[in-house]
Amino acid sequence: MLETGRVSKRFLTIALGSLVVGAMSGASRDLRAQSPGPAALSGVVSSQQEGNMEGVVVNARRDGANFTVSVVSDAQGKYSFPRTHLEPGKYGLTIRAVGYDLSGPGSVEITAAKTASADLKLDKTNNLAAQLSSLEWAMSISGTPEQKDKLIYQTVSCAYCHTLERVMRSKHTADEFVALITRMQTYYTDGSAVSTDQRGRGQKGMPDQVAAAEQNPIWGREPLGVPKKELAEYLATVNLSGGRTTWPFELKTLPRPKGNATRVIITQYDMPRADTVSHDLDPDSTGTLWYTDESRMFFGKMDPKTGAFTEYSLPSVPPGDLPGARDIQVDRDDNIWFPRRIAGAGIVLTRFNPKTEEVSTIEGVGTQFMALGPEGKIWAGWTRVDPKTMKVEATYGWEKSPNIPPGPHRQYVDLTVVNSKGNPYAPDIGGSYIIGIDAMTGQAKFWQVPTPRSSPRRGRMDAQDRFWFAEYTGDKIGMFDTRTEKFQEWPMLRKYTTPYAVSAPDRNGYVYATSNMSERLIRLDPKTGAIVEYQIPTEFDSKKIAYDPTTSRLTLWMVNTRTARMMKVEPLD
């Protein structure tokens, strides 16, 4: 059934100061700047312990602005912000370098006339625990490999919603942890993301989820599901329970970025609502970024030229029902598609026309993930839709296939990608297979990922019909060539990286992956296997990577789900 209507709109012009004013007068600089250009601010980062320091993330935020620009110091300790990225004004400066704090508050005045200079002195930190990523906690904590695997190698682990620091700083006993683990199971995971800077929010699940949590003695899923009591007893040995004021293990850290990993500019824009939990984004042909909220009934856009956000409200759902939407897909006509939740835990496929602001829905097409296929077809899970007529053309499935391999099998929540022949493929996160369906015959086929129990997750199909995907518990990036039916895998630099989402290759052939455990964006050169890890300036969790279609220099966009920010990454090499 096709329904149409309209949504109400809220314009949210965020505090960008002169940038927004300039945009209104037609004089604003494009925040998608095409070339770094001359420096607005430069300096040297050093410490008494190391001298000039490489790999220190330096952050600059103008007073009153809603965005922060970050660069990384080079091998000589030098950092530089291009003038294209910093307007004149007073800026606060902060750093990220594990083991160090900035000596005193950092600030600088930037003018249009000359390059400002600010040398930064760092001191050894007195609170190393507050600086550790979840991966560094995993490296540090005591326990057997089996205990750590059961804690971390879960498709929805503690670090899916917050960092492991929260667990390690707790003082819960084993008995208290059992009740706490049960309470955590009552939250809707994709609608919950809580950062240490008080952004994001927790979202309770549906009543049936809450009831199931009370009855379930297990935390996690097979094959690594663990009895809550067993996990609770382990966690009570590594937190601050029993009157401990420090941890019974050495805190270990990752090396800071070096070489190519320092050649990047990262800009993060605060979303209007600090409690937004945005799962996905997609750019349209003009570069405008569209996003959804996983736990609120609205969707929005950000204009990268001005940094201004606009929100569009959606019909509410009854109390007790889950609100929000997950994936979002822009079609070839710049219409916006997303799965919207409705009363009774239902989902309807929704199309928004930005020109007319008309909303159309297709009932009976419910899924969580979207894809764009050949000829511009919209895919909602295994269902193919003609975007012009909004008619369902076909719906496929694999569950009744006669050739299903021995289980268990669990497709990753209706995620599909589509090759040039119009055939859909999906990761089987439970069985570690790639599932493909011939769109002409409806026949399903299964290919086992070379690494067992690798939990294949989100990815993209490229123009050569290669499906690039994350191996979440395999700590690898995988590629399945749908033409040759061959796999290739590339390992991450270290265990417990747990890559979540993988991009298609960029114009230089590089592939990117997100890691909420390491709080780094990973770049892979598939030809050599070389990996570059870009340090994200804040906590980091992103579910999808998109390329900007309008910039001459490579630009990646992501939603930082953990901190409710839109994030732009510009590799400089």
Map each language-model feature to its residues:
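Structural motif
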Residues: 44-53, 86
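A short, solvent-exposed loop/turn motif at the edges and junctions
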Residues: 63-66, 88-107
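Short, acidic Ser/Thr/Gly-rich low-complexity loop/linker segments typical of extracellular
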Residues: 63-80
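Extracellular beta-sheet/turn segments enriched in Thr/Pro/Gly and aliphatic residues
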Residues: 109-134
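The canonical Cys-X-X-Cys-His
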Residues: 154-165
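Beta-rich, blade/repeat-based domains predominating
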Residues: 274-286, 318-333, 364-375, 402-421, ...
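Conserved beta-strand positions in repeat-built beta-propeller and related beta-rich domains
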Residues: 289-295, 331, 336-344, 372-374, ...
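Blade-level signature of beta-propeller repeat domains, shared across WD40, Kelch, NHL, RCC1
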Residues: 536-573
